[in-house]
């Protein structure tokens, strides 16, 4: 499928990311609709021009109109949605997601939809420390990295359609990784860094530390303010890979600690 101005796009889930997708695509002149159980989210998105129309409940007539469907949902909710409403999607449509884990999710989604609808995983590497559609921004993905995670079940045409979506959003760099490669990369670059930030914030009573904090602590802990429900689910979906990355970090942190304990200046300088 070629992604052009004639194509209709459905966003399922109007939070920060789904709302920002809607805002960015509407700003490019695309017809965007949405499904979200929160009537206030639908009303806000309509009022601010993020979407042309929306529903709080999916129905076959509505969801069957769209050529491209973007799921901005937690992994387990995405799979539940596809299991229940997937047959309503138009034959020949393309479906994609924004979830931060791919192994298991992509394969299960494809099994629920194929061959009528082709599902391809994608992950925009952008976000904010706040949630909800009220904080959505049309420029959220400008200059961001955008990862597409095709499998052998995907055609080249669909892969290129998903990459075109990334370009419409304003992504600077678009990459292709397998779901496994994605989860290994994301376990280190994103999930591990969030774990470190959370650990820093919880290892010491911090009520009065704000009076003495400098840039280094603020920079390291900025991402500690996270959606605990979403990130817990993402960590558990990627548990084995994240544990491997945590063990790697602990080993290198231990090496630095040992060098400090032994007064080993050369090792410390080398690591720095």
Language-model region placement:
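Internal alpha-helical scaffold of NAD(P)-dependent oxidoreductase catalytic cores
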Residues: 138-223
């Amino acid at each position: 499928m070629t992604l052009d101005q004639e194509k209709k796009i459905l966003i399922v889930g109007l939070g920060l990311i789904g709302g920002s997708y809607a805002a960015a695509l509407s700003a490019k002149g695309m017809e965007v609709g949405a499904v979200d159980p929160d009537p206030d989210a639908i009303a806000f998105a309509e009022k601010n021009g993020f979407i042309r129309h929306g529903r709080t409940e999916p129905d076959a007539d509505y969801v069957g109109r769209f050529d491209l469907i973007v799921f901005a949902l937690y992994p387990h909710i995405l799979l539940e949605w596809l299991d229940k409403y997937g047959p309503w999607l138009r034959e020949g449509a393309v479906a994609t997601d924004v979830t931060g884990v791919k192994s298991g999710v992509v394969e299960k989604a494809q099994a629920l939809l194929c061959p009528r609808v082709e599902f391809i995983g994608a992950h925009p590497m952008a976000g904010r420390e706040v949630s909800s559609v009220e904080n959505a921004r049309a420029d959220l993905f400008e200059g961001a990295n955008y990862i597409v995670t095709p499998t052998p079940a995907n055609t080249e045409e669909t892969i290129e359609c998903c990459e075109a979506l990334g370009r419409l959003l304003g992504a600077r760099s678009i990459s292709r990784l397998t779901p496994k490669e994605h989860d290994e990369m994301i376990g280190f670059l994103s999930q591990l860094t969030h774990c470190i930030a959370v650990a820093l914030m919880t290892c010491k009573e911090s009520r009065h530390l704000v009076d003495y904090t400098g840039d280094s602590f603020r920079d390291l802990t900025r991402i500690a303010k996270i959606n605990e429900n979403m990130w817990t689910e993402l960590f558990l979906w990627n548990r084995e890979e994240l544990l491997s990355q945590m063990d790697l970090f602990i080993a290198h942190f231990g090496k630095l600690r040992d060098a400090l304990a032994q007064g080993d200046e050369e090792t410390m300088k080398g690591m720095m």
